[in-house]
């Protein structure tokens, strides 16, 4: 009756909602198996949340047949790997596009599973066409591992087997018939991936995967000829390679060659033959005294889970190597096993070899192989090999650590140790021998597993308990096959003692696209991980795992952007350093030049300071003052003097040609006489000279404006005012004007040499340009006269409208220029 209830509960499709945002949806149909020989208890009825003491539970149940992977986990998975530019989106998209073919494959697998459900208590070997599916309740916390298998005839693909590490707290012993079918845990899921990949036109061989639970004993079973093994706590002297050495009397369980999932194993020195279940039954065992009820009748009992606290049962028990995600990131389930055609294993079939060493009874060791997730670039092939001693009650089972996961994926350590009795000829596997409290830190593409102390309560018979860290023995595919021909275990003891101290903590930078490439030498070299692999000394105790800050790396439009919770150390690249050195060198040289220049400037300033401050005299009032107090042309001490002077000059146009030269301006400054006093007499005496020289003086030498000195008339124009009656009274008393007049007559031939013609109508374009430049504030406008090709005659014809409209000159400069032109005409 219990069997029927279990079968009914399993055959129905169910969906499991995992509290830690990890959702795994598959479809399954399984028949329950009862133990017919070793125990009378049946597997408790499966309920999704019945008796859940800890919600960090994963139950892998197949869901609706045509359901697309449209869950939040799958969508986030696609987005994450798209951002990280992994090669994972192809298969995820393929799963979505080919969900109809998935449904067909799943339907076929369910039909095959239902046909095999009738074999409830059967422990006989299953043929290829009928492989039973099982359900498993491994703890009262309702952690259920529901797996299914499918007949090889329904899906003509070669798929590797599944090795399942089963176990939890307070669960009765598992029969060999159950354990035999645990191995087929993910056959249908892998087949789905193969169907999808082949529908895309790819030949995709799938390697096997390892499903483990952290509180379980090890079960390594062949699908057809199950040979169980008890995982014993390996000590430093008993660390074996991935393929256990079994030169004498090694027993290898293989399938018949007619099966699609046959195991082709290299033959060792001892004859390796397919063993039946009946032969394996002779290796019965008593329960271990450490509380590990390891009923090791291999055909009947594979392993018994050890009694532990429920705290260690937080890790997921599922057919997909997924771990509950605390950080809310989905992990890679087997349904989303990413198939990389360029990095898949070259063999379709992975062999799970279980070998015995009856002649080494005390040192029988079981190698615990853990693969927490599937690497993004390779489908991991992992198997369990155990040396099953004749006295299995003396080989207690190690307890696996509770690994709380903060991410979607745990690291698969890339390694292959291929030997004669290797589990796979090209399989990639990794040895993680857990003993007492090694700090373990597994990281994957965007994850980081925080280390947890491994609770190990059992020890080997001969070797006392030691603190031995995780053994990591990766082998590259390029390394030649190492055949374990050593018969002395002490050599391996020495190597293992070296290797045990090499694994401290493994922390791979998250987000790096390349998988962690682990390389290892001949065995004494410490394995290296591309991210970081802190190595411990041989004599030092293993330190606590260093939890490094998680750094996310993004590639956005060609720019590598790293994102971390802590500030990055300031490290300048060599190129920047060189540039900085060059800049500093240039700056230093420039500073030296600047210093030299500043020294020269200082010298010149000192020379100038040594010179007396220039003193000016107002041309109107005769006030003597420093030059900086004089404004504009430095001729007048104030604007009042300038205005009064200009009013006087307006009356007598172009009177003294000598006033335009700087030498001439200084002499009348010496006396209080005003040059305007002699205006009347000058006009009377020399009317002809006034017209010629006055006109010529209106265009002084071009160097005069640079001295700040301009002609009389230029100053007049800047201060032009209507003549007021006060202007006449503003002039001082007449003084001897003969002197200044004679001086002006002396300068007349000098000034006429500088100009081409005294008649404005004879000026050319350059003369007009110089004339306009001499006007204050009209230097920029002079260029416009040159561009318009205005010569002397055109200048005489210019009017205000021409200046303002045609030449686009502002009103102020236009009035000044026109006033000057009028003066020239009048003169």
UniProtKB/Swiss-Prot annotation:
Tissue expression remark: Isoform 1 expression is stronger at the posterior border than in the anterior region within individual somites; On the contrary, isoform 2 expression is higher at the posterior border.
Compositionally skewed regions (Basic and acidic residues) per UniProt: 485-498, 661-675
CDD domains: SAM_Ph1_2_3 (cd09577)
Biased segments, Low complexity type: 9-38
Gene Ontology annotations for the cellular component aspect, listed alphabetically: nucleus; PcG protein complex; PRC1 complex
Region (Disordered): 1-78, 282-316, 482-545, 653-730
Entry protein name: Polyhomeotic-like protein 2
Organism annotation: Danio rerio (Zebrafish)
Gene assigned in the entry: phc2
């Amino acid at each position: 009756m219990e069997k029927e209830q279990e079968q009914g509960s399993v055959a129905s499709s169910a969906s499991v909602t995992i509290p830690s945002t990890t959702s795994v949806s598959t479809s399954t149909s399984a028949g329950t198996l009862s133990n017919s020989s070793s125990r009378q208890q049946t597997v408790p009825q499966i309920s999704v949340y019945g008796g859940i003491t800890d919600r960090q539970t994963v139950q892998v149940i197949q869901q609706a047949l045509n359901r697309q992977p449209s869950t939040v986990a799958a969508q986030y998975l696609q987005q994450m790997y798209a951002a990280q530019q992994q090669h994972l989106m192809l298969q995820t998209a393929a799963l979505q596009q080919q969900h109809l073919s998935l449904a067909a494959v799943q339907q076929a697998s369910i039909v095959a599973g239902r046909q095999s459900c009738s074999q409830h208590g059967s422990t006989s070997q299953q043929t290829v066409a009928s492989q039973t599916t099982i359900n498993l309740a491994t703890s009262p916390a309702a952690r259920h591992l529901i797996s299914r298998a499918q007949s090889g005839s329904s899906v003509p693909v070669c798929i590797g087997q599944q090795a399942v590490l089963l176990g939890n707290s307070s669960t009765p012993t598992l029969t060999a018939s159950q354990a035999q079918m645990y191995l087929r845990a993910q056959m249908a899921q892998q087949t789905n991936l193969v169907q999808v990949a082949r529908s895309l036109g790819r030949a995709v061989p799938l390697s096997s995967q390892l499903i483990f639970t952290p509180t379980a004993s090890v079960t390594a079973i062949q699908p057809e000829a199950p040979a169980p093994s008890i995982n014993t706590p390996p000590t430093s002297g008993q660390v074996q390679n991935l393929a256990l050495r079994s030169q004498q009397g090694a027993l290898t369980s293989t399938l018949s060659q007619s099966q699609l999932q046959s195991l082709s194993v290299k033959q060792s020195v001892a004859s390796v033959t397919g063993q039946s279940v009946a032969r394996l039954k002779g290796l019965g065992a008593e329960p271990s005294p450490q509380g590990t009820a390891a009923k090791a009748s291999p055909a009947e009992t594979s392993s018994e889970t050890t009694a532990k606290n429920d705290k260690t049962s937080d890790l997921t028990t599922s057919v997909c190597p997924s771990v509950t995600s605390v950080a809310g990131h989905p992990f890679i389930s087997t349904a989303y096993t990413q198939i990389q055609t360029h990095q898949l294993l070259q063999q379709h079939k992975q062999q799970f070899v279980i070998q015995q060493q009856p002649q080494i009874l005390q040192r029988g060791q079981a190698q615990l192989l853990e693969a927490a997730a599937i690497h993004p670039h390779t489908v991991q092939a992992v198997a369990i090999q155990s040396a099953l001693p004749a006295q299995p009650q003396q080989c207690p089972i190690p307890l696996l650590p509770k690994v709380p996961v903060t991410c979607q994926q745990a690291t698969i350590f890339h390694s292959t140790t291929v030997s004669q009795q290797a589990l796979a000829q090209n399989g990639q596997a990794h040895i993680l021998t857990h003993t007492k409290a090694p700090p373990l830190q597994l990281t994957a593409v965007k994850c980081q597993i925080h280390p947890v102390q491994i609770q190990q309560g059992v020890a080997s018979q001969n070797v006392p308990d030691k603190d031995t860290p995780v053994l990591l023995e990766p082998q590259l595919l390029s390394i030649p096959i190492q055949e374990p021909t050593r018969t002395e275990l002490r050599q391996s003891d020495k190597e293992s003692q070296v290797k045990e101290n090499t694994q401290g903590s493994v922390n791979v930078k998250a987000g790096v696209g390349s998988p962690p490439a682990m390389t290892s030498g001949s065995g004494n070299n410490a394995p290296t991980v591309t991210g970081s692999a802190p190595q411990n000394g041989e004599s030092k105790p293993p330190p606590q795992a260093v939890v490094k800050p998680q750094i996310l790396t993004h590639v956005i439009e060609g720019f590598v952007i790293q994102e971390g919770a802590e500030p990055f150390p300031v490290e300048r690249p060599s190129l920047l350093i060189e540039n900085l050195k060059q800049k500093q060198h240039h700056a230093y040289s420039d500073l030296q030049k600047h210093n030299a220049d500043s020294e020269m400037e200082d010298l010149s300033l000192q020379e100038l300071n040594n010179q007396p401050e220039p003193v000016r005299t107002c041309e109107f009032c005769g006030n003597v003052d420093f030059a900086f107090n004089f404004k504009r042309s430095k001729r007048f001490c104030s604007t009042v003097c300038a205005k009064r002077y200009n009013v006087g000059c307006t009356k007598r146009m172009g009177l003294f040609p000598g006033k335009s030269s700087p030498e001439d301006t200084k002499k009348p400054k010496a006396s209080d006489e005003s040059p305007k006093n002699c205006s009347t007499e000058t006009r009377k005496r020399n009317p002809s000279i006034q017209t010629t020289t006055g006109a010529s003086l209106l265009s002084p030498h071009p160097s005069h404006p640079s001295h700040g000195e301009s002609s009389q008339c230029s100053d007049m124009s800047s201060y032009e005012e209507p003549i007021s009656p006060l202007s006449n009274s503003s002039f001082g008393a007449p003084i001897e004007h003969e002197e200044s007049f004679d001086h002006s007559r002396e300068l007349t031939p000098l000034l006429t040499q500088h100009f081409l013609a005294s008649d404005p109508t004879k000026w050319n374009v350059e003369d007009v340009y110089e004339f306009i430049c001499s006007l204050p504030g009209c230097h920029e406008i002079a260029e416009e006269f040159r561009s318009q090709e205005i010569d002397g005659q055109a200048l005489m014809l210019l009017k205000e409208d021409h200046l303002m409209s045609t030449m686009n000159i502002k009103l102020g400069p236009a009035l000044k220029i026109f006033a000057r032109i009028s003066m020239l005409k009048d003169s």
